[in-house]
C-alpha cells in the first residue's frame, strides 16, 4: 500500500478503456506545426458565447503527466483554458465557470470528464488523474480528450455560498455548461463529436457523477461515481469538523503560526499505517506488490 488516496473504481474504468479501441481506424496524428495551428484556431472557431478562451500547445515528448519526472512523455496536445459567464456576485467577488480541456493530437475518439472534490474551486490538471498508480498511463496519454472545471468559483473555501448563482453553479450548472462546451470544442478541433464519453469522480466528484446520471443521463456512456458525498449537511459534515479539530491539535505550525494540516501525520506515521495494511491485506489480491487491490477481502 502507498500512503495516499487512490480511486479503485476510476482505475478500473481507465484500465478497461485502455483495452478498448477508439473509433474505427487508427487515431489521426497531425504534424506538430499543423497541430499547433489547429490549437490556436480553436479560439476564433469555437462559437461559444460569453466565454473567454486561451490556448497553449504542448509538443510531444516535452511533458510528462502532472509533475512526474519519470515515465512516458505525453503526446502533443492542445490545452484550452476557458471562463464562461463571467460576472460579479452579490458578495462583490468575481465569478466565472472555469475549465481546462486537453486535446491530444492522437485523439482516440473518446472524452473523459474528471470530477472535482471538496468545495472545488480549482482546476484539476487534465494531464494527470488521481487514479493513476502502478504504471497506469494517464487518460491524456492514452489519447482521451480530458476536461476539468472549478465549478464556478476560485478558492477551496465555502465562501462562494454567499452568492446564490455560485451555489447553483456548484450544485449542477457548471458541470452541465462544461460538458456541453467541451463537446463543442472537441468538434471544433477534430471535426466530429466524441464516439464515447465518460465521467469519473470520487467524493465530491462522485456526487457530480450521481448528479449527471439523474439530471443529464444522455451526456455520458459510462459514469464512475466513487464514494459520492451526498448528505454533506448531515453527520458527514460534523465528522469532518471533528477530524479537522483533531488534526489542528497535533499539526505543526508554520512561521506565521498557522497549522499545517498536511503534516499532522509524519511520514513515519503514514509508513507505520501502510506497513500494517500491507501485512494484512497486500497478499489478498494474489500479488505482493505494496498495492492492496482486493478491497473486499
Predicted regions and their residues:
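Bacterial N-terminal signal peptides that target proteins for export
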Residues: 1-9
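Glycine-rich His-Gly loop
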Residues: 86, 116-119, 228
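Gly/Ala-rich beta-loop-alpha elbow adjacent to hydrolase catalytic centers
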Residues: 200-205, 209
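C-terminal motif of bacterial Sec signal peptides marking the signal peptidase cleavage site
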Residues: 16-19
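Catalytic-loop region of hydrolases
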Residues: 22-110, 123-126, 133, 274, ...
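A catalytic-pocket lid/entrance helix-loop region that shapes and gates access to the active site
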Residues: 211-213, 218-297
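Cap/lid segment of the alpha/beta-hydrolase catalytic domain
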Residues: 108, 116-194, 237-238
Amino acid at each position: 500500500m502507498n500512503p495516499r488516496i487512490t480511486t479503485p473504481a476510476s482505475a478500473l474504468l481507465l484500465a478497461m478503456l485502455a483495452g478498448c479501441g477508439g473509433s474505427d481506424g487508427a487515431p489521426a496524428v497531425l504534424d506538430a506545426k499543423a497541430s499547433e495551428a489547429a490549437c490556436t484556431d480553436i479560439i476564433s472557431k469555437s462559437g461559444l458565447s460569453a466565454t473567454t478562451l486561451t490556448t497553449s500547445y504542448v509538443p510531444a515528448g516535452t511533458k510528462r503527466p502532472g509533475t512526474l519526472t519519470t515515465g512516458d512523455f505525453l503526446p502533443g496536445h492542445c490545452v484550452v483554458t476557458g471562463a464562461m459567464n463571467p460576472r460579479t456576485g452579490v458578495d462583490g467577488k468575481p465569478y466565472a465557470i472555469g475549465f481546462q480541456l486537453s486535446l491530444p493530437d492522437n485523439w482516440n475518439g473518446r472524452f473523459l470528464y474528471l470530477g472535482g472534490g471538496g468545495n472545488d474551486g480549482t482546476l484539476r490538471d487534465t494531464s494527470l488523474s488521481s487514479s493513476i498508480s502502478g504504471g497506469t498511463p494517464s487518460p491524456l496519454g492514452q489519447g482521451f480528450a480530458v476536461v476539468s472545471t472549478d465549478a464556478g468559483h476560485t478558492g477551496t473555501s465555502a465562501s462562494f455560498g454567499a452568492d446564490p448563482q455560485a451555489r447553483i453553479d456548484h450544485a449542477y450548472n457548471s458541470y452541465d455548461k462544461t460538458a456541453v462546451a467541451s463537446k463543442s470544442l472537441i468538434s471544433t478541433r477534430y471535426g466530429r463529436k466524441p464516439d464515447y464519453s465518460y465521467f469519473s469522480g470520487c467524493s465530491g466528484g462522485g456526487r457530480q457523477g450521481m448528479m449527471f446520471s439523474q439530471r443529464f443521463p444522455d451526456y455520458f456512456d459510462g459514469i464512475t461515481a466513487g464514494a459520492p458525498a451526498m448528505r454533506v449537511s448531515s453527520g458527514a459534515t460534523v465528522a469532518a469538523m471533528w477530524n479537522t479539530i483533531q488534526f489542528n491539535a497535533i499539526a505543526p505550525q508554520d512561521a506565521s503560526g498557522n497549522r499545517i494540516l498536511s503534516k499532522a501525520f509524519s511520514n513515519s506515521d503514514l509508513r507505520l499505517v501502510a506497513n500494517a495494511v500491507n501485512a494484512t491485506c497486500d497478499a489478498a489480491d494474489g500479488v505482493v506488490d505494496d498495492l492492496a487491490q482486493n478491497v473486499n477481502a
